[in-house]
């Protein structure tokens, strides 16, 4: 029996964890195995090869850590940098704030570039810092690709353009937790040195895998890194890669089989089709928000996210009450506003293995909730705006043509 049972399917529309597809659930429904047997290394080898495809890299080296995105952050930092190293890090929302907190606690010299919440990274400030850094004291640029607290997406290619323009050797470390497998991400083309994601986001798996991919330049940086690391030491993994056994400690067998199934689904749909689907869902959600007479927390079109929409509420309405009522009355999970935007926004997650009709159900629920809390929404307005757009843009399902 569920701890808090509700009839029918629960509607999960937070920006992670996300819905898990049935084939993935079935793939994970298995007993434990001996990870030292030939089967698990053989499985792991194919996973590592295929994970590179979702990062769009041919030269990167992937690592599958039994952890969350927070552990993946730590792995990226401690394997490439030394205590006291200067980092330029962008603060644009709650999750970039948490990464910066981790950087400081790991004793890096963090040069914080802060923007108003709802804005993207201030690249003009970065350009100024790079132009003045003739001695190359900046060792890394840390940036969150998609900030789920505010629904803001940063332009990673523009960061690489600045680094190249100033011929600066700083490493580019990118949090792609809520973007990889949902938004356009090109590790090799954009010159990303370390990219990372988490299994519970667009991969549509349970929480528990922190997936990190390192460029050859990042691997070279491990030779001079003096940060203390044990659990997240890339060199331990690389040693077992060479042995062909792949695991320095016990992996989650069930998550590995789940990852295999998740990647198979991604390749069946096609990564570019998945990116296009997320673009449709994001556009439909924004049209609904506009029809309701509400505003997006994201302040410019160039920063909009196609994986999450943070919806601003009027001052007399508490965004957390919308989230509470969604769960209590409608069996719907929406995202809370966090930190500076707590109570000021609620968030609609539209990432992972989710389709257009599922989204329309969520939007219908939000309309009822808005009416419940006293907002004068015109019932059906957002659903009509979204469905009119989607009806003209949903493609045929390739496997059913």
From Swiss-Prot:
pH curve summary: Optimum pH is 9.2.
Q: Could you say which tissues express the protein in this record? A: Widely expressed. Preferentially expressed in green, leafy tissues, root cortex and epidermis, developing siliques and dry seeds.
> Which residues, renumbered to this chain, carry the PTM Phosphoserine?
204
GO BP terms in the entry: photorespiration
Instruction: Identify the residues that bind pyridoxal 5'-phosphate.
Output: 68-70, 148, 200-201
* Residues binding 3-hydroxypyruvate: 201, 347
Q: Which Gene3D superfamilies match?
A: Aspartate Aminotransferase, domain 1, Type I PLP-dependent aspartate aminotransferase-like (Major domain)
In this chain, where does the modification N-acetylmethionine occur?
A: 1
What name does the UniProt record give this protein? Serine--glyoxylate aminotransferase
Phenotype of the disrupted gene, per the record: No visible phenotype under normal growth conditions.
Q: Which GO terms describe its molecular function?
A: alanine-glyoxylate transaminase activity; L-serine-glyoxylate transaminase activity; L-serine-pyruvate transaminase activity; mRNA binding
- Placement of sequence motif Microbody targeting signal: 399-401
| Position of the signal peptide | none
What EC number(s) are associated with this protein in UniProt? 2.6.1.45, 2.6.1.44, 2.6.1.-, 2.6.1.51
Q: Does the keyword Manganese apply?
A: no
Protein task: Photorespiratory enzyme that catalyzes transamination reactions with multiple substrates, including asparagine. Functions exclusively as a catabolic enzyme in Asn metabolism. Involved in root development during seedling establishment after seed germination by regulating serine homeostasis and acetate conversion.
Tell me the enzyme class: transferase
Location of N6-(pyridoxal phosphate)lysine modifications? 201
């Amino acid at each position: 029996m569920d701890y808090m049972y509700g009839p029918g399917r629960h509607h999960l529309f937070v920006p992670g964890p996300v819905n898990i597809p049935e084939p993935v659930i079935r793939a994970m429904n298995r007993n434990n195995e001996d990870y030292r047997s030939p089967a698990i290394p053989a499985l792991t080898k194919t996973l590592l090869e295929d994970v590179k495809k979702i990062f769009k890299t041919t030269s990167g080296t992937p690592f599958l850590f039994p952890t969350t995105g927070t552990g993946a952050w730590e792995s990226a930092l401690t394997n490439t940098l030394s205590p006291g190293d200067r980092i330029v890090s962008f603060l644009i929302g709650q999750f970039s704030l948490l990464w910066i907190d981790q950087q400081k606690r790991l004793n890096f010299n963090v040069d914080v570039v802060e923007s108003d919440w709802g804005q993207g990274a201030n690249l003009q400030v970065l350009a100024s810092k790079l132009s003045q850094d003739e001695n190359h004291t900046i060792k890394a640029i840390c940036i969150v690709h998609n900030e789920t607290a505010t629904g803001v997406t940063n332009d990673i290619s523009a960061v690489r353009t600045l680094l190249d323009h100033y011929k600066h050797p700083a490493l580019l470390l990118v949090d792609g937790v809520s973007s990889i497998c949902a938004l356009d991400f090109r590790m090799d083309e954009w010159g990303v040195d370390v990219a990372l994601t988490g299994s519970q986001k667009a991969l549509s798996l349970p929480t528990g895998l922190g997936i990190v991919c390192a460029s050859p330049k990042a691997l070279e940086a491990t030779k001079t890194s003096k940060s203390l690391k044990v659990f997240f030491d890339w060199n331990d993994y690389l040693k077992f890669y060479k042995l062909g056994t792949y695991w320095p400690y016990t992996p989650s067998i069930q998550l590995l089989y789940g990852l295999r199934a998740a990647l198979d689904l991604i390749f069946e749909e096609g990564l570019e089709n998945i990116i296009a689907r997320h673009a449709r869902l994001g556009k439909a959600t924004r049209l609904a928000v506009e029809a309701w007479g509400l505003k997006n927390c994201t302040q410019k079109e160039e920063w909009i996210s196609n994986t999450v929409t943070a919806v601003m509420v009027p001052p007399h309405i508490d965004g957390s009450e919308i989230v509470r009522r969604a769960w209590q009355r409608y069996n719907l999970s929406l995202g809370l506003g966090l930190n500076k935007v707590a109570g000021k926004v609620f968030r609609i997650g539209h990432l992972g293995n989710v389709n257009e009709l599922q989204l329309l159900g969520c939007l219908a629920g939000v309309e009822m909730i808005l009416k419940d809390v006293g907002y004068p929404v015109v019932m059906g307005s957002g659903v009509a705006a979204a469905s009119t757009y989607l009806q003209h843009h949903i493609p045929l399902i390739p496997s059913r043509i």
